[in-house]
Amino acid sequence: YDNEIERIEGEFENGDILRVEDFDGYPLGCGFINTRSKITVRMMTRKKDTVVDDAFIEMRVRDAWEYRKTTVDTSSCRLIFGEADFLPGIVIDKFSDVLVVESLALGIDCLKPVILDKLKKVLAEDGISIRGVYERSDAKVRLQEGMERVKGFIGEPFDTKVEIVENGVRYMVDVQDGQK
């Protein structure tokens, strides 16, 4: 949080990934910064020498999917759950063959294309094809992060009414106008 930061050294832009240290200079890991946010730094890793690159993002996405495969028996689930999956500020739900993404932090918003690309790749390795992605990043908190509210297709448009199966029961979900 902003009140826990003593100083920020070096040049950066909001959304950049920085090394984080405690008051004695001991490395705490890496996180992305946004001085406009009350949560000034969102930690991506507690490992001090980690490089947050495409391979790192793929590892985080793969770990999240591997965990979901052991706990979920449905055509739909929350694939990425922000901080719980060490990808703070982003939630990605799978409704059958459609992904719905909500990005609430500037730093993760910058990584959103890579996260979605790696997620599609990891799912494809298990024979899961994604026909479309819809963004529901329209929460007011985005304004506090210095971002616009966004709602719409990422890529080609598709029918936003999706049939899912949960516990043997079929449901119709409207990813565009339904509950996020």
Tell me what each language-model feature is:
Residues 83-87, 91-93, 113-180:
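Non-catalytic substrate-recognition/targeting regions of SAM-dependent transferases
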Residues 42-51, 100-112:
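Short histidine-centered catalytic/ligand-binding loop motif
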Residues 22, 32, 104, 175-176:
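Short clusters of small/polar residues that mark proteolytic maturation junctions
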Residues 37, 107-108, 179-180:
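Short, surface-exposed beta-strand-loop junctions and turns on beta-sheet-rich folds
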Residues 27, 99, 170-171:
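Hydrophobic residues embedded in beta-strands of well-ordered beta-sheets
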Residues 1-96, 159-161:
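Non-catalytic accessory regions of SAM-dependent methyltransferases
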Residues 55, 59, 109-117:
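Short, well-ordered alpha-helical segments
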